[in-house]
Design a protein with these regions (language model features):
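Active-site rim elements
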Residues: 103-109, 155-157, 220-233, 251-254
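Double-stranded beta-helix
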Residues: 166, 176-249
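Non-heme Fe(II)-dependent double-stranded beta-helix
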Residues: 2-44, 51-160
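Non-heme Fe(II)/2-oxoglutarate
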Residues: 14, 20-23, 201, 238-243, ...
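Extracellular structured ligand-interaction cores
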Residues: 47, 133, 164-170, 180-182, ...
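Short edge-strand/loop segments of extracellular domains
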Residues: 140-141, 186-194, 267-273
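Secondary-structure boundary elements
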Residues: 122-130, 159-163, 172-180, 192
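Short, structured patches in soluble enzyme cores that scaffold and shape functional sites
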Residues: 135, 140, 155, 167, ...
Length: 341
């Protein structure tokens, strides 16, 4: 198998692998057995922390690579003065998806870390997985050049498609304490998802660009509170993997301290759950160095065109600064080897 991208472009060649039958994934519906590890937390609470999924030394090196990427962008904008212009476009939630950043070598190295991949293999009981080309989070505290990061509680799953369908994740790269911003989840909310959406079926929905996103209104938040659900800020150390059921209500907070927040969003699913059209679309995203949402089947693909004040960023990039070199295991995560010739 040719399982390594070239240094000039992302055109790929491969030997087609058979798409295996679906395995026995966790159900997260109260019927799962006890596992004696973090999976019990996931089943009960709708989220879990896998401590040290990435060894600390490597996590620190990835954080350094992320800083270097930002500093390289800053050098390209050396004649400007404001923070906004010295950085790539990063929204108030800390997310960056343009500039081909989602395919930088550090992003792929993090996605293909054994401890990260193995965690998702345990959930899906499957080694034939594909991974999302999702956003990178560069959350800097006290930025005055961005809008306020207001709470945006949501679930990343279409209410009309119930049940456990997707496990979201992020790999944390810097110390992340209770006041350092980051992921906040509604503990146990995943188990109430179907009941909630039955009761709120006629509520006017918050506008969204995809049906796979549902925002919770004040009435919805009150309902969750009355059901005894509590919101918990998830704290983590460098190298920890955070995972959550996409039905679990969640959002992210901005830091109240001087501590930045760096993380890489990582979501895996069995390749058996993706169609051949999905895989072809995913290959196109990989070859164009563009990102996807958290859905690994590339339901939606993005763009590398960052905008500033409505205009294309003059420092847009359309390929990674440091292109990834993927071994056979990582290349399978692109989904390309499973495309039928």
């Amino acid at each position: 198998m040719s399982a390594t991208t070239t240094t000039e472009n992302a055109k790929t060649s491969h030997i087609t692998l058979p798409v295996p039958a679906a395995k026995h994934a966790l159900k997260l519906d109260g019927s799962d057995p006890s596992y004696g590890d973090w999976r019990d937390d996931l089943v009960r609470d709708g989220y879990a922390i896998i401590k040290g999924a990435v060894p600390r030394e490597r996590a620190d090196s990835y954080a350094d690579a992320m800083y270097s990427w930002l500093e390289g962008f800053r050098k390209a904008s050396a004649k400007t003065r404001t923070d906004k212009d010295k950085l790539p476009w990063i929204d108030q939630k800390g997310m960056c998806l343009q500039y081909a950043v989602t395919h930088e070598d550090f992003a792929w190295a993090i996605r293909s870390e054994p401890g990260v991949v193995e965690a998702f293999e345990k959930v899906y009981d499957d080694k034939d997985l594909i991974v999302s080309f999702d956003a990178i989070n560069f959350g800097f505290p006290n930025r005055k050049d961005l809008p306020e990061n207001k709470p945006w509680p949501h679930q990343d799953q279409d209410p009309l498609k119930p049940g456990f369908r997707c496990l979201q994740g992020l790999v944390n790269m810097l110390p992340n304490g209770p006041d350092d911003g980051g992921l906040i989840v509604c503990r146990g909310g995943h188990m109430l998802s179907e009941e909630f959406h039955r009761e709120f079926i006629n509520e006017e929905r918050i506008p969204a660009w995809t049906p796979e996103w549902f925002g919770f209104t004040d009435a919805g938040m009150k309902w969750l509170e009355e059901k005894g659900c509590q919101w918990e800020k998830v704290c983590a150390e460098p190298g920890d993997l955070l995972v959550w059921d996409s039905r679990t209500p969640h959002y992210n907070l901005s830091s109240k301290t001087q501590q930045p927040r760096f993380c890489v969003y990582t979501c895996f699913m069995p390749v058996a759950d993706a169609s051949q059209d999905d895989l072809v679309r995913k290959r196109d995203a990989f070859e164009r160095w563009v990102g996807t949402t958290h859905w690994p089947n590339a339901r939606h693909t993005g763009s590398n065109v960052g905008k500033r004040d409505g205009e294309d960023d003059p420092h847009n990039r359309f390929e990674p600064v440091n292109k990834p070199s993927l071994d056979e295991r990582a290349f399978k995560l692109t989904g390309i080897p499973y495309i039928k010739a």
